[in-house]
Amino acid sequence: MAAGALRGLPVAGGGESSESEDDGWEIGYLDRTSQKLKGLLPIEEKKEKFKKAMTIGDVSLVQELLDSGISVDSTFQYGWTPLMYAASVANAELVRVLLDRGANASFEKDKQTILITACSAHGSEEQILKCVELLLSRNADPNVACRRLMTPIMYAARDGHTQVVALLVAHGAEVNTQDENGYTALTWAARQGHKNIVLKLLELGANKMLQTKDGKMPSEIAKRNKHHEIFNLLSFTLNPLEGKLQQLTKEDTICKILTTDSDREKDHIFSSYTAFGDLEVFLHGIGLEHMTDLLKERDITLRHLLTMREDEFTKNGITSKDQQKILAALKELQVEEIQFGELSEEIKLEISGDEFLNFLLKLNKQCGHLITAVQNIITELPVNSQKITLEWASPRNFTSVCEELVNNAEDLSEEVCKLKDLIQKLQNERENDPTHIQLREEVSTWNSRILKRTAITVCGFGFLLFICKLTFQRK
């Protein structure tokens, strides 16, 4: 093998590497004057030229060398074929040429398939999608796993390639296959924070309840990696599109998943909201839709369900397993309360700086949750009263409560402003006290920021409630 071989060819997906340090791929400038093959060249020289042409992506020279007798499935010291290398750099044009010349799309090296290599390639999703589509058109199996039991769809989900994921499923890829650690494609997408892929996988029938080997569901994996929006999506709400494409033919699925469907999803979300009552929406969201008829027969409303005691659950025929789901969902909806009663009298009189800062942080966090809740309600409420099909009481009752909320928010804003002024006064006195040792400026600045954020959050919450009030009055 030539001495100028490339070291460090792109490693196979999943972190698998070859024991050989010399893969046989040579990188360097290819002299264009040597590209025209005059007569027969020694086979080793042809191979070297072939490797150079592959490295720089010279399609015309690759074709010329293949015409001169180089095998399209020739392997080099690393063990990769030309097609595998072309797939690893997402060179769709080279992949097409090699496949047209008869390259084996199902080749694998140490459980590393060409399709896996393409799905984990470094390149644009457009080029990766083209490569994957070409390989699938030549009957590459989308369910063959690597040594770590990861399938192509897992690599595509991990790397954030939504269209590739959908295309693989359309060609028969199993959505709920698990790797050696129990990860599914959905788990990988949740771990990496790819919201669009999470939604697409749910639409394609992914099971969000499958656990990893250490007992974690995708929602918990998302939470552990601080992807809170995905955590909320997977842990509480049920995607209205879940499993929608499972029963379609391959042709219909390919047509649907490769077209823009934003308008369709908006229409679906709206119709889902208005077609069910609040009780049905809640039960469907926590996977208890089978209880709908039972609760309706007993005239149990959502408000009644959420305030039931344990004996009432049993009396109405709700099993302990279903009770746990309802209570868990209710717990998710509750805002954490600050227990002042747990503080000793001494701390109440002379609270420490850390405890006071913790109090402000909790207060700010709760205000943020309240603002988000009001924003979600404003977004979800239909603008036309004729489209409301839920069981609603008189809107006057809602307006009255909103007025009380606005008043309370205004009172809270006023009290926080008083608190801020008091703390500012204390801070000024401490700074002017010659006997006081100054704290680091950074700490002072941080505390000031917390106070400002708290005040702004409270004022913002009051403003949102005011808007909510106006909305109800208009309706």
Swiss-Prot record:
The modification Phosphoserine is found at residues 17-18, 20. One of its GO terms (cellular component) is pi-body. Its main location: cytoplasm. PROSITE patterns: ANK_REP_REGION, ANK_REPEAT. Gene3D superfamilies: Ankyrin repeat-containing domain (1.25.40.20), Transcription Factor, Ets-1 (1.10.150.50). GO terms for biological process: cell differentiation; male meiotic nuclear division; regulatory ncRNA-mediated gene silencing; spermatogenesis; transposable element silencing. Residues 1-25 are annotated as: Disordered. Keywords: ANK repeat, Cytoplasm, Developmental protein, Differentiation, Meiosis, Phosphoprotein, Repeat, RNA-mediated gene silencing, Spermatogenesis. Pfam families: Ank, Ank_2, SAM_2. ANK repeats lie at residues 45-74, 78-107, 110-144, 148-177, 181-210, 214-243. It is found in: Cytoplasm. Residues 272-334 form the SAM domain. This is Ankyrin repeat, SAM and basic leucine zipper domain-containing protein 1. It comes from Papio anubis (Olive baboon). The gene is ASZ1.
